[in-house]
Amino acid sequence: MKLSLILSIALCSTRVVYAAGAEAPRISRNTVKLHSYNESRVCRHDESSNQTVSHAAMFTFNFQDGDGYRVYQVPRCLFNTHAAREVLSSVDMTETLESYRKRFRVYFVVPIYGAYRLVARSPTAKYPGGVLNPPPASSVTMQDLIVDATNIHTVVPDKLCVITEHPVIFSMKVPCSHQVITWTGYTVTVSLAQKFFVLTIKPTRDHTSENTLAMFFGDVREVDLKAPYTVGAFLLRQTPDHDLLVVVKQTAFIQRYMFLTDVVFLQRTLSADYADTSVCLRVLSVLASVVARGKQCGLITRDTVEFFFTYSLCQLMANGTRYQSTAPVSTALWRQSELELFGEFIRHCFKTTTPNPTPAFQTRMQLTEKHKPAHSSNAIDVRVLAATYSSGMHAASMADLAFLLRSTRIPPNVNTDALLQKLLFTTDAYYRMSLKIPLSGSMRRILIRVDLTVRTQLNESSVARRHFVLLTSMCSPREQISWGELLMNPQRGAPSEIYSPCVSGGRRDYTGPSVRALMESAHRPERRAEQVMSVTEALRPKRSQMSDEANCVPDSTQGAVITANEKTYLISSDFIVKGLAIPVSNTVVDRNLMITVLDRRSPCVLSRSYRERGSVIVMNNITFTERCEFCASTLVEYDEVDGLTSIMHIPSIEVLKYLTDPENDILVATPRVHYLLLTANGTVFEVTDILVNVRPSMPYSVVVALVIIAILMALGLYRLCRQKR
């Protein structure tokens, strides 16, 4: 009876109540005009009658009330509509009252005593930007860019999100984009519609929906709930603009999601001005910091749920942003690159088996009209063309563009060197500065984009290999110490902010004991070492994602990789892969050091025995000229007891002079410390005396003059000898 009353009230009343916005004009509450009949008829609702009533055009319900009847009527024509059939097919008309009551207890209902809160904007909720700010505006505007970036964040719905036969929610079909994040333990799904998103969290091994948490946020008026539930039953949070509904079974709530009733749940996110994408990204960075520092990668906790919620929210807010054609490109490129960087953070932190969940801009980018080829058959390499227009950009914006156009499985598969070549000057400058001072936040912001751009290019691009060896060289003991200090700052957590070249994948020789010893020697708390290793293991790429010649080496194997133009050096404690093995003899017992020389693009073959063996060529000193014959070589410092310590690339004569200057105190002259010079052609030298004499080469004109003088002297001596005969 109760269900019949609900249906009659809903269908015979013309007053429509919205969650927000204007009301429909008021008409008499209990009348519905039927235009499908010749004469006007009205349905009777809650009227008294002294006899039962029936009508061919109506469903009529007569309930005895004393000596009379209460009459309720529903027009038959309303049940012929698609909406009515959808409603009736979703409702069990034969359900008993007892079953109805039990069903109400199946799902978690938000308690009145404190979990539900209206979250207001907090003027004191300030999130310092740090490097999470757009770079300085450049002279390049949206209309100058070769690709249309005015809607750079907009993701066109390519799927239909469907909810059918749900115990709580009426059937719903909404155009959306669908992002799946899967790792050992859980599957997280972000379904992004135009006005709201749905975040679902489900244990991977659970093939039912018993433990699934669903969070609807945004303008959720399209979500209709079945009786006995109302919107208020699942309304966990409200802001002035949006609502949050949570749908989860009571047993799952008790076992897994009790944090939903925490008063501070989502407070940091919803109290900020999250409609501003830049602010949303800063909040997300703080949550990423909590997850990474708290060793919560791969877990489902209150902090990780807040992180995934805010990640979804930032995408929803950015999705509706449109930039003016005259606006500088800096803000748009920075925001999109940050969104995709957070996707990389998720992929590495949670060790997902799915790719970067952020929809890549390059999958939907289109050339602007003025850059489209005259004929469709003319292929245009976007990266080459982008490099020609990047001269007016700040280096940070150029790094954003290079990262957004990074090579993936999306054609073209080979990233040209155009943008990377322009960024090489910046990477080289930062490397030279890192020899003197710690890396700054703005440097790290650019270097992470360079790192993620070159990782997949180590097989094809010589420029990418030069970037990689510079990043490897920046991972020094000084960097480990300064990075440890940075990781202790709770306000820094975005991938851009906590990046270190030590997670680029070049140096895997740093271990827990070695980092602890380093921190102890620098008088740093032991917790610094634990933090450094925790973040390193969480964010460092797998070897399988690197260059071909060393991608089969297990990730657990310690060692360093140094890339030259046509050679790759693998430094480890033992022989691991097939290649030219060069043992290093100057180590103590039980401290082995092996250098394996590999050809670029050669297949990686695991092997514990070597057939090719080389040797280290010992040189008392090496003399360089201004032509820098050994430039593009790498100087490796190792300790007889502690093993590999520093890697220093030599890109230019200026760097060589700085490294060998005694006043800079970089090269150490002790009996335990040795230096190896790894050249570009695969030869390994040991410099025993740490003596490198840099002297200018003779000018060409002087050489020619000396040669002429020598010839004349020889000719004079020849004639003199003939005369004496």
Curated annotation (Swiss-Prot):
Gene3D superfamilies: Herpesvirus glycoprotein H, C-terminal domain (2.60.40.3190). Keywords: Fusion of virus membrane with host cell membrane, Fusion of virus membrane with host membrane, Glycoprotein, Host cell membrane, Host endosome, Host membrane, Membrane, Sialic acid, Signal, Transmembrane, Transmembrane helix, Viral envelope protein, Viral penetration into host cytoplasm, Virion, Virus entry into host cell. GO terms for cellular component: host cell endosome membrane; host cell plasma membrane; membrane; viral envelope; virion membrane. Disulfide bonds: none annotated. Pfam families: Herpes_glycoH_C (PF17488), Herpes_glycop_H (PF02489). N-glycosylated, O-glycosylated, and sialylated. Residues 1-19 form the signal peptide. Residues 184-247 are annotated as: Interaction with gL. InterPro entries: Herpes_gH, Herpes_glycoH_C, Herpes_glycoH_C_sf. GO terms for biological process: fusion of virus membrane with host plasma membrane; symbiont entry into host cell. Residues 722-725 are intravirion. It is a single-pass type I membrane protein. Glycans are attached at residues 38, 50, 319, 459, 621, 681. Belongs to the herpesviridae glycoprotein H family. Interacts with glycoprotein L (gL); this interaction is necessary for the correct processing and cell surface expression of gH. The heterodimer gH/gL seems to interact with gB trimers during fusion. The heterodimer glycoprotein H-glycoprotein L is required for the fusion of viral and plasma membranes leading to virus entry into the host cell. Following initial binding to host receptor, membrane fusion is mediated by the fusion machinery composed of gB and the heterodimer gH/gL. May also be involved in the fusion between the virion envelope and the outer nuclear membrane during virion morphogenesis. This is Envelope glycoprotein H. It comes from Murid herpesvirus 1 (strain Smith). The gene is gH.
